[in-house]
């Protein structure tokens, strides 16, 4: 993955995928954890599990959230590969505690207003009706996680994700630069003029 590896986390609708895509556009190495690493597993053991039959849509939504894990062996493998200067893992994982200490930093995207999150979820589901966040039970779960901050790293740098996307990414890169004492290296940095 990279010599320096960072996790970008946050509640659904805070902009993790948008940030990941903008970082990629700027030439950074990005791993979309929710696409490339996720599986349904036992939150305690990590063993893959089959989804049971649920009594209600709410039970199904909660179960899926609680059992959304990232493959730890894959995460460790990517972190051990130092062929990139900087890499970002973006997405939500219920087992981040199993690998968070291997990372150089964590950024937590935050949106204070739940209505903004609902609007973003509605926009996302309008583009892809199968995406998470369109059902009332999913919005209820998002509201709970937003309120309690459960399943969100508590040790990360909070990034105000109500800013325009480019400002959010600039702020993340500013923190990376400060931590490294230099400009984050990106193949497209000179072309885009972004720092």
For each predicted feature, which ranges?
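Conserved Walker
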Residues: 18
């Amino acid at each position: 993955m990279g010599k320096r590896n960072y996790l970008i986390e946050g509640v659904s609708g805070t902009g993790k995928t948008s940030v990941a895509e903008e970082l990629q556009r700027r030439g950074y190495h990005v791993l979309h954890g929710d696409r490339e690493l996720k599986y349904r597993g036992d939150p305690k053991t990590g063993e893959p599990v089959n989804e049971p039959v649920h009594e209600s849509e709410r039970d199904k939504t909660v179960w899926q959230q609680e059992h959304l894990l990232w493959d730890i062996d894959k995460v460790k493998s990517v972190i051990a590969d130092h062929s990139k200067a900087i890499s970002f893992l973006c997405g939500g994982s219920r087992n981040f505690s199993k690998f968070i200490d291997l990372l150089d930093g964590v950024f937590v995207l935050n949106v204070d207003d739940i209505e903004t999150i609902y609007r973003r979820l509605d926009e996302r589901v309008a583009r892809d009706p199968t995406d998470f966040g369109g059902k009332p039970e999913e919005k209820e779960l998002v509201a709970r996680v937003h309120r309690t901050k459960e399943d969100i790293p508590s040790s990360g740098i909070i990034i105000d994700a109500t800013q325009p996307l480019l400002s959010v990414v600039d702020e993340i890169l500013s923190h990376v630069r400060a931590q490294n004492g230099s400009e984050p290296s990106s193949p497209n940095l000179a072309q885009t003029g972004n720092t």
